[in-house]
Amino acid sequence: MDEGTLEAAITAYSAQLQQVESALLAGLDPSQQADLLKLKEDLSQLIELTEASLVSVKKSRLLATLEEDDGLQSLATGTPANGGLDNEFAAFYSEVGEVSGSSSDMREREDEREEEDDGEVEGEVDALSGTKVRAPYRTSWGTLEYHNAMIVGTESCDRNEAQVRVLYVHPTQKSMKPCPFFLEDKCRFADNCRFSHGEVVYVSELREFLESDLTNLQEGSSCLARQDDGIWYSGKITDIDNDFYTVKFDSALLKNVMVEADGVIPPLREDDLPSCSDSEDDDNGEGEAAFPRVLTQEEDWAPSRSSSAFGGWEAHTRGIGSKLMLKMGYEYGKGLGKTSEGRVEPVLAVVLPKGKSLDQCAELTARKTQRKVAKGKDGQQVSRNKRTRKARAHNTGGCHNVFDFLNRKLGNGDANPEAGGTCGPPPSHTPSSQGAGVEAYKGGKSTKRNLNVKLFQAAERVAQTEREIQRLTESLSRRTGRDSSMVTHLEEKLSAARSLLVQQKAQELSAQRENRKADTHKKMTEF
């Protein structure tokens, strides 16, 4: 930039600064006043940077003028301009013993020229301060990324190449976030600071600043959104309402946020990668030739025999596989293989036992198959046996006299059926279940004690569940109207506790009936 442009910029910035100062004197709202104070500070810094750039340009112009004057003066005095005569004079002075003084003068002149060249380079680099660029950033895992940044200063030249220090505008990691105390020279941690003190990069590595275009953002678009910690995280836009964007972050640890337009940008990293859309739009067809193609005629392709859509499982993933295949020339909807008649379903994954050989895995698979077949046959046999028993019970009929009834109730299962009647115990009851039922009905001491313990445990469970229901009810009343998710969770737990209470009360009633039944039998049998 020339002097005129810089002076005009300084004049414009000064006028804007005066307008801001007059607006501050007018007495506005505290919120507006804070914004104006921030704007005033930014304008002051911008004026200082522009003035520094103007001084650098003036220095460069003056140095160039001085060099021209030195050249004209040397021509006027007859001093040779080429280096050959200087060498001859140096040889002559060496012969007469004055070579030391002349060589020192030559070295001084060369040092002065180098200092002037370095000053010009530093002046050009200083003029870049405050410029927005795209700078490289090397992550801890070794990848190279380009992010929007701003030049904040210069560094010592390395390998005859200028270096600058940049601060990233949209930090995506804590190590990229500018240290709030670095610009004020108040940071006490130096290189051990967890925040960024600027990244030193070569000037040749800088790229043009990429402005964020919010017009392409819509619901479902990927984006970068700023969190309260000042770091920009990747996510997707779920809703747009009057320049307010609702963003769902990719990380499950971050909650959905609603940000304004200055808190969301498109994912700028994707533009760094070579896009295949540019090659597809090429009129010369070079993009299509860049990918290997197998089919050249439409009739060579036949529809796939499978009814499932290719890549249907990627509805649950990010779909990186299909994207890579499309970049390699795959045409969507066609099968794999030379004639595009291959499979489109994924190969099912079979998890084999750990530490087993393939022979053992095959044997285990065969055993599972045999068990399934045998289980099916056993099920058919069991159902056939059930039908046979039901038919036999229907043909024999039930008990016909009062003696069979008394024998069955009082536990005389070993009595001869022919002595007391034609019917024994029903075939559906096993002897063990009959003995337990008769023992419970007779009300023996051990059985009575077990019934009492069972009744006590049932009562304790009911009391504990009632206390839990009371606690959940109190907690729900306290949280009503605060946290909807917690209220829903408490309501679910309360409903489950009430269902459990109904079951436990039913068990308690059953235990009470058994206990009363044993007491009744004891009273009827003891005279």
UniProtKB/Swiss-Prot annotation:
Transcription repressor that specifically binds the 5'-GGAG[GA]A[GA]A-3' consensus sequence. Represses transcription by recruiting the chromatin multiprotein complex NuRD to target promoters. Negatively regulates expression of EGFR, a gene involved in cell proliferation, survival and migration. InterPro entries: G_patch_dom, Znf-CCCH_4, Znf_CCCH. The gene is zgpat. Residues 384-393 have a biased composition (Basic residues). This is Zinc finger CCCH-type with G patch domain-containing protein. Keywords: DNA-binding, Metal-binding, Nucleus, Repressor, Transcription, Transcription regulation, Zinc, Zinc-finger. Gene3D superfamilies: 2.30.30.1190, 2.30.30.140. The keyword Oxidoreductase does not apply. GO terms for biological process: negative regulation of DNA-templated transcription; negative regulation of epidermal growth factor-activated receptor activity. GO terms for molecular function: DNA-binding transcription factor activity; DNA-binding transcription repressor activity, RNA polymerase II-specific; RNA polymerase II cis-regulatory region sequence-specific DNA binding; sequence-specific DNA binding; zinc ion binding. It comes from the Eukaryota. It holds the Pfam family G-patch. CDD domains: Tudor_ZGPAT (cd20384). A zinc finger (C3H1-type) spans 173-200. Residues 511-527 have a biased composition (Basic and acidic residues). The keyword Transcription applies. Residues 317-363 form the G-patch domain. The lineage of its organism: Eukaryota, Metazoa, Chordata, Craniata, Vertebrata.
